[in-house]
């Protein structure tokens, strides 16, 4: 057991006050030196690290806000582009309808013009046919009348007489 006391450096009932004071003094000097040499720089490094982390958090927050603002701007621009595209499509539809109406109106007018032209041409051809038939009837009537009467009257007198008769017949209708 004696050996245990030697190893530990103390006796069982004996306190060495000088050793206690020396140990305490060395501890305090060592703490002072650690504070000056190690604790100050260590705390400075920790402070710098804390500031770096805070600035990175602040930068990340700023970037998040900027990206959110950019996203909102992009949404706004997209909405504006969609609205503009919709108005262009609607304008094109209206323009298409107007052009369709103009084309239909022009086609109807052309059809009416062609119809009226055809009716005038038909009327003209009808008048020509009636005049030709009249001339033929007059010629045949003169020929028939001259054969019936066996005498020949002047063709001009006979034609005038027949035209007068046909005109009276036309008025009677």
Curated annotation (Swiss-Prot):
Domain of life of the source: Bacteria
GO molecular function, one term: proton-transporting ATP synthase activity, rotational mechanism
Chief subcellular location: membrane
Alphabetized UniProt keyword annotations: ATP synthesis, Cell membrane, CF(0), Hydrogen ion transport, Ion transport, Membrane, Transmembrane, Transmembrane helix, Transport
Protein topology in the membrane: Single-pass membrane protein
Keyword Disulfide bond carried by entry: no
Membrane-spanning parts: 20-40
InterPro entries per UniProt: ATP_synth_B-like_membr_sf (IPR028987), ATP_synth_b/b'su_bac/chlpt (IPR002146), ATP_synth_F0_bsu_bac (IPR005864), ATP_synthase_B_chain (IPR050059)
Cellular component annotations (GO), alphabetically ordered: plasma membrane; proton-transporting ATP synthase complex
Subcellular location: Cell membrane
Quaternary organization: F-type ATPases have 2 components, F(1) - the catalytic core - and F(0) - the membrane proton channel. F(1) has five subunits: alpha(3), beta(3), gamma(1), delta(1), epsilon(1). F(0) has three main subunits: a(1), b(2) and c(10-14). The alpha and beta chains form an alternating ring which encloses part of the gamma chain. F(1) is attached to F(0) by a central stalk formed by the gamma and epsilon chains, while a peripheral stalk is formed by the delta and b chains.
Role played: F(1)F(0) ATP synthase produces ATP from ADP in the presence of a proton or sodium gradient. F-type ATPases consist of two structural domains, F(1) containing the extramembraneous catalytic core and F(0) containing the membrane proton channel, linked together by a central stalk and a peripheral stalk. During catalysis, ATP synthesis in the catalytic domain of F(1) is coupled via a rotary mechanism of the central stalk subunits to proton translocation.
Family the entry assigns: Belongs to the ATPase B chain family.
Cross-referenced HAMAP family: ATP_synth_b_bprime
Name this protein carries in UniProt: ATP synthase subunit b
Organism: Lysinibacillus sphaericus (strain C3-41)
